[in-house]
């Protein structure tokens, strides 16, 4: 009858059914593209009981609708409602109300009149609080408020005594009202992705609770009170910072599913064996060294996952698990299996990948039901003959490169025992460790490797591919998690298909080479990069005393690293790629690094580091002396990478590349670095909720800290690196949580202690606050946040927490991009400092989050690590000023002069660029860059002679290529804040530092500049660098030797000024997805390394190259050209920018372009497409800026919206009971048009920043495609609305934290990723700061483009058009900082390789409206063009309206009248657009197909 009634409802005029007309009670108008409620609905107001208006574009509900007194169910999800009319009180019979996925900001107070309401679904709305009247809905049984902006619940919330289901995922809750103990009927409570630092006390009083989600929070302990929940069946505590589980958990007698993945557990309580009903136990991605024997009591256990731990044996009692069906023990250190394993006869899937198995017990043949067995990456020489009994075996994986699931086995006689064994051509297995690396290094083909890597990079950056990569990274985690290098190789080989067909072999080679490389410098670097990335991902616990180890690396090399490597979770495809790049860099760089480092012998470096960084990392931060910090930016970076940063550098081995002072040292260093990386990455990884990438990001970010924070940053970085995993105390990381590094920001006090290698937890607590740590996307911001954290604990923690969540993916690549040779050196220098950390890499490493967590974060970690490293190394650098001193002596970042410098420092680029030491000819290139540009790699490692236009760079001299990158300049600007700062720094600082590798070196330079305006810059300047000028085809025209001195002085002067400020800004920038991910093009890196012929030009070139560098990294095939272009562009741009601009504006521009690191996607995209993107920086920059907002950090903590929840969660544990939460698909559906710009003109502007989530027309798309994290980014994008809200709130928090940082914050023009822009509500909170922040974002853009709207962009607080430095955007930017992480990730996901993003200025005259609709934004419903993009997109244009000939669907709005829409809330964007008077000047990004 219902169908008939629906039909009748549509055929009202038909008299045949007139008799039944009055009986019509249900009308369904779902998916009808309605813009208003159909009038025929009112014809049935007396009888209508159910009305469905799902997925339309309805913006308001007519009053007449509320005359339908009989209405019982009103369903209007996925529309454009901005408010719920008060007349809803007249629907007294309403029982179900669904307003999810709209723009509703609050419930009307008189909702209390709807006494019959039993179900309310209001998820994915920017609701910041519930009215008091809400608690009078006493019949409410189900309440869904996922992905809103709730910071607290009403005190009398306990009045809703009939509540059975309460879902509050992805909000900003820190506590629960005590009255909730009255909710005696509550069965399901979802508090995932919030900001709880401890389990709410009231929880143990809700006795009837059956399902509890507390994942993605900041819990450090699982208290025994949880054992009071006798009815609890499902408990998800994954992605927290839990170090201990209380014995009393055994009280949960009914518990069936226990998810403890991605925490910091070192042991499980014996009482776990009392959970007799347990069917699923997931403890993967922790730091377990053993399992309790009581595990055998879990007789009903069906699924057991203990992958990515440090297990050296399985208890024999495992044989009692007779119900076990799935057993995963990947990435541990098992030398053998217990014979009792054969008693698990029901196991169908068993994965033992990446262990140290040398033989299998005969009893394995008793597992008759075994269908899938993964033995790859072990050391098996053969298989027992009993394998012939496994009749159901369908897949036997013996190698990551295996072409078929089942390869025939032959019977042979064991050479010693003469027993029959099974073997085939894949035996004996070659360990991925040292042996493999060594064996492969001999046959390593740099050219082939480069080509394959480029291909991989391209795939990684493609939108869809990226998605797959991300997924594969997550999926492959179990498979590809191996020793750090193993991971690199294996991850690559395992996921080569995902990355690219040829990826596997190159990776394997890379890994092998890395292993070999530990002996040769270049190899060690490669190995180290790979290992480092892996380690970071793995977050090895013990940060080996890398500082001491940079020299010690050789001793550490190989074995230890191998262990660490195994520990790391499999990197995402991108991570793998990055690792490969790192390996390449290591291989190629070693000679350079060696030479350079030869100048500074390992011992010397260590001594230097030790002397200068006696404090170890903490001291550096304490020292804040720009000079010291900058003196050894490269070394410090290296050390940081190796040690503290290493934790996060794993994904960015190139960045971490230990370009050894000697090849040997390099080799050893690579090993040590790997270990360190592992350790640090572990910490950071653990800390970052999501993934090793995050951890990496944190590390990298930390490192990025520049200037005054530099010393602090060093400490913070170090600590944060360790603390990434270790510092659970970091509470606000809920959002940042995914980014361990971010989350675990070390408090300013702690930062100085870094040299002491604070316990991971100690180190992480504050440093991880760095917003940049959290996300790849917002990596720059994160790091900046970290630095800010050093200066301002509040800010740092917030910033860090936000980015941690969503940015890792992007960051990872970016991080990898720039590792200056000096960085490597810095790693060496850092080694002495790192020495302090436990010699066992595992001890301090907090495990990085599992691949599922978002490996992309790791890249950022890597980058962060370098940042940290450079800081300590800065001291060293003082000794070798020639390299670092350069223009960045003051510590100005290449991109951001003031706040930006710190940010830059945090960036990989900064790390790379900071080591112009003549002794260190090594040019570290971030892995991404390497990957993208063979040239970069080549440059990084003299070994690598790439066929690309860029020639190898001499160790002694850096060749800077002046690439015509005017477009790239914007691209470079986009590329990353890190890069930007270089660019800006360059001109002001003379770009002397430019001698360092552009991406990292610039950051390093920034750091140096910030650290002090000492002679070191001059020393660096003294370094002769070669600048290559590229023709437009990007072919080197010739090398010009240039000295860095010119650059050095200007940077120092300005940078010193911004030393402290920059650190804060840098963090944000680091956070920015684009900024972070915009790795300086290789050339940029080169340009750092080598003074340009024209300092200014060089500076520009460096900055430019950095911008392209991101592109470089992103796009393997057009690496050279993009790099060249970027370089050229940057070279010219800095000249164009006035010093004020450079610092405020230019640096800002760097920041913007750094944000454009996010926007780097744009340049990258252009690079991919071979076009320059300078003209479009604003959009991408805006996006990048949003990406780098620390505010995002908070958001990142809760990266997943209710819908993306499952996707983002780790593995199955993520699955949650069915709920009303909208599905991903639903979210995507909603994406098309969040708001109608015509109606919400004003709102659009603000929200666009937040909602600009939709794919940027070009750069964004590229960016989105870029991230290996694409899949997660997509989820985040979908969550973008939530994120928007969260980011905005976070941004507010960041604002608070970073306001003191505002001087640098203004700089922050951290690239505000679209996601970084806080939602409307949050923007309101942020107030002018936020707007300023947005403005600064645009400003960065603008700087690049020098668009007329820059001032407007910044107009809220300050007109960014004016010098950004004075602008107090920082706080607002800081506010947005948290979002950068997400932005970064999303950016990654969104970057499209299909078209070139073009930016246009459009002027529209209202008549009366604007004539177009928008969707996306932080709190928007997403957009149909680039779901992972949180930007504001045009979805509809009225044919004959004011915008008919100017806009077209798919255009991404970057700015409106100077307001940055990059990470703006949808609602704010709409309000902004509506608020504009007659003329609206838009800066849009349009993706043009090739």
UniProtKB/Swiss-Prot annotation:
Biased composition (Basic and acidic residues): 663-676, 872-882, 1134-1144, 1243-1263
Domain PDZ: 1398-1488
Alphabetized SUPFAM superfamilies for the sequence: L domain-like, PDZ domain-like, RNI-like
Residues carrying Phosphothreonine: 831, 865
Secreted in keyword set: no
Protein location: Cytoplasm; Postsynaptic density
Record PTM Phosphoserine, positions in chain: 439, 441, 443, 850, 869, 947, 949, 1118, 1233, 1288, 1392
Biased composition (Low complexity): 687-700, 859-871
LRR repeats: 23-44, 47-68, 70-91, 93-114, 116-137, 139-161, 162-183, 185-206, 208-229, 231-253, 254-275, 277-298, 300-321, 323-344, 346-367, 369-391, 392-413
Tissue-level expression: Expressed in brain (at protein level).
Positions of region (Disordered): 663-704, 785-807, 822-899, 1134-1158, 1196-1218, 1238-1265, 1282-1312
Keyword annotations from UniProtKB, A to Z: Cytoplasm, Leucine-rich repeat, Methylation, Phosphoprotein, Repeat, Synapse
CDD domains assigned: PDZ_densin_erbin-like
Residue(s) carrying Omega-N-methylarginine: 1149
Annotated PANTHER family: DISCS LARGE, LEUCINE-RICH REPEAT-CONTAINING PROTEIN 7
Listed name of the protein: Leucine-rich repeat-containing protein 7
